[in-house]
Amino acid sequence: MKLVRKDIEKDNAGQVTLVPEEPEDMWHTFNLVQVGDSLRASTIRKVQTESSTGSVGSNRVRTTLTLCVEAIDFDSQACQLRVKGTNIQENEYVKMGAYHTIELEPNRQFTLAKKQWDSVVLERIEQACDPAWSADVAAVVMQEGLAHVCLVTPSMTLTRAKVEVNIPRKRKGNCSQHDRALERFYEQVVQAIQRHINFEVVKCVLVASPGFVREQFCDYMFQQAVKTDNKVLLENRSKFLQVHASSGHKYSLKEALCDPTVASRLSDTKAAGEVKALDDFYKMLQHEPDRAFYGLKQVERANEALAIDTLLISDELFRHQDVATRSRYVRLVDSVKENAGTVRIFSSLHVSGEQLGQLTGVAAILRFPVPELSDQEDDSSSEED
């Protein structure tokens, strides 16, 4: 993301002009734009024209509109963002108050104005404009007959290819059908890797599986690379890292990211930090339950006691339509930071973010036990009963 201009007043009102440069920037933009903001961008509008003879026709014209945002729609797989709203500035083609939908595009600038720029949104702009936050991890999660080829960016896990091949069971004295199907499966996975992984950007490719599938696959891939003189695969062989995962399903990627070998290789990436924080939370919940809580009320009470060491919070909560609720989460983040706590904002498009979402989207690891929080939890549950 490129920051063109930033004009924010002391009261935190103002506007920024940005240029999304890659697909992931559309996800950052989705998290920046909120209902009630004003968005100015170039767009296509269909307009009716009347000729001197009285015949009516229609043309598509490019014009610049400023909308008061009413709805935002994001397609995570296509990385497309559509913003619907009403026109709030005079325009020769569009009446004031008329509805229009702007489709924001990579490499086309837009200006976003808000009455209140909060700390979470401003931090996201800083991160989005930092080149160190680019996608640098890929993963192949596989089992016999099933594989997912994923890109792990700082903000999301993107499934780029799913490979499924029916593998017949081995039969006594006749393994040829099984072996042919397995080779066909491996070949399709290799093709998916070559099609979807950019080795100029990616620093590490995780190959995760149960059993010996990963070893057998890597042996096949590099034997074929030698035979066909595939320089791209051979030159990047050192980037492939084999790790254990319980299955070839996407959710098993979390296990691979938790592997200590992987964690050391990816120690500087946001994704690895999220995975470790969530893993630490689960361990604390199991071994010292008085130091691990989830749910907004419990976490707010822990914050009032100045007990929060690490706050885990989903970015989905900052997209809440209700301004008061959204502000409540922002205040929580600011307060934890002021009290020297660590804040981890999880992407809801990451496997770890999906898991945090199942725990209400907000959780905390405490510096010291707060037993009365557990008592309050028990009281509230008994009242519900």
Curated annotation (Swiss-Prot):
List the signal peptide residues: none
Q: Which Gene3D superfamilies match?
A: 3.30.1330.30, eRF1 domain 2 (3.30.420.60), Pelota, domain A (2.30.30.870)
Question: Phenotype when inactivated?
Answer: Embryonic lethality due to defects in chromosome segregation during cell division, resulting in aneuploidy and loss of genomic stability.
Keywords attached to this Swiss-Prot or TrEMBL record, sorted alphabetically, are: Cell cycle, Cell division, Cytoplasm, Isopeptide bond, Metal-binding, Phosphoprotein, Translation regulation, Ubl conjugation
- Which InterPro entries does the entry mention? eFR1_2_sf, eRF1_1_Pelota, eRF1_2, eRF1_3, Pelota/DOM34_N, Ribosomal_eL30-like_sf, Transl-rel_pelota
Compartments reported by the entry: Cytoplasm
Positions where Phosphoserine occurs in the chain: S374, S380, S381, S382
Highest taxon of the lineage: Eukaryota
Pfam families to which the protein is assigned, alphabetical: eRF1_1 (PF03463), eRF1_2 (PF03464), eRF1_3 (PF03465)
Q: Where is this cross-link: Glycyl lysine isopeptide (Lys-Gly) (interchain with G-Cter in SUMO2)?
A: K162
Required co-factors: a divalent metal cation
The tissues where this chain's protein is expressed are given as: Ubiquitously expressed.
A Gene Ontology biological process in which this protein takes part is: chromosome organization
Molecular function in Gene Ontology: metal ion binding; nucleoside-triphosphatase regulator activity; ribosome binding; stalled ribosome sensor activity
Q: Any one cellular component term from GO for this entry?
A: cytoplasm
Protein family per UniProt: Belongs to the eukaryotic release factor 1 family. Pelota subfamily.
- Quaternary structure and partners: Component of the Pelota-HBS1L complex, also named Dom34-Hbs1 complex, composed of PELO and HBS1L. Interacts with PINK1. Interacts with ABCE1. Interacts with CNOT4.
Question: What is this protein's function?
Answer: Component of the Pelota-HBS1L complex, a complex that recognizes stalled ribosomes and triggers the No-Go Decay (NGD) pathway. In the Pelota-HBS1L complex, PELO recognizes ribosomes stalled at the 3' end of an mRNA and engages stalled ribosomes by destabilizing mRNA in the mRNA channel. Following mRNA extraction from stalled ribosomes by the SKI complex, the Pelota-HBS1L complex promotes recruitment of ABCE1, which drives the disassembly of stalled ribosomes, followed by degradation of damaged mRNAs as part of the NGD pathway.
Q: What is this protein called?
A: Protein pelota homolog
Q: Kindly list the organism's lineage.
A: Eukaryota, Metazoa, Chordata, Craniata, Vertebrata
- The record's gene field reads Pelo
